[in-house]
């Protein structure tokens, strides 16, 4: 019988890109899930609903997949990190990158329901260290997207117009309804 590893991640996978991942300049869809983090830089005129979201760092997914191949027995494990909300992300980005404060979206407070998910079983069964914290994942994803943006600017892409583009904002919020237009 062949061993099977079936990844199931009911959360958003974020994290930095691999060094050889190439995104066509101006192609925001190429940012994939990192677009959610890039959306926080849409400017104060963009208002985000304060939704909670779970995440798993892409580096943790890779390690879990390899570890899953090596374990014996049948297991059902959830790949998830702690849940956080948009307001916490904005506050965290402000604390680590105060230079971005004028570029950050605003957040409308709403009531929060945070699902309870415990990654400790997966960590224990797979024999892995603690998963990447949401703060580290956000910081690394933010830096990766800013690096991409910097490369785009070098070849003439107007990053400001990308962030102001309602098509971009629609792509960012597709399925999440997390962008409220204020104009």
Per-range role (PLM):
Residues 2-3, 15-33, 67-77:
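Glycine/proline-rich active-site loop of Rossmann-fold NAD(P)-dependent oxidoreductases
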Residues 13-15, 61:
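Conserved sequence/active-site signature of Rossmann-fold short-chain dehydrogenase/reductase
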Residues 12-13, 84:
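Conserved beta-strand elements of beta-rich interaction domains across eukaryotes
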């Amino acid at each position: 019988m062949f061993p099977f590893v079936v990844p199931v991640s009911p959360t958003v996978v974020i994290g930095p890109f691999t060094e050889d991942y190439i995104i066509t300049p101006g192609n925001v869809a190429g940012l994939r899930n990192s677009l959610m983090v890039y959306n926080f830089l849409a400017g104060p005129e963009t208002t985000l609903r304060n939704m909670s979201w779970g995440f798993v760092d892409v580096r943790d997914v890779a390690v879990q997949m390899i570890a899953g191949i090596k374990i014996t027995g049948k297991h059902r494990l959830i790949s998830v990190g702690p849940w956080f909300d948009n307001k916490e992300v904005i506050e965290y980005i402000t604390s680590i990158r105060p230079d971005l404060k004028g570029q950050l979206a605003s957040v409308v407070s709403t009531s929060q329901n945070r699902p309870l998910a415990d990654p400790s079983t997966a960590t224990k069964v797979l024999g892995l260290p603690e998963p990447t914290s949401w703060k580290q994942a956000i910081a690394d994803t933010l830096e990766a997207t800013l690096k991409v943006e910097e490369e785009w600017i070098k070849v003439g892409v107007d990053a400001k117009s990308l962030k102001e583009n309602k098509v971009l904002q629609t792509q960012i919020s597709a399925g999440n309804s997390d962008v409220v237009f204020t104009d």
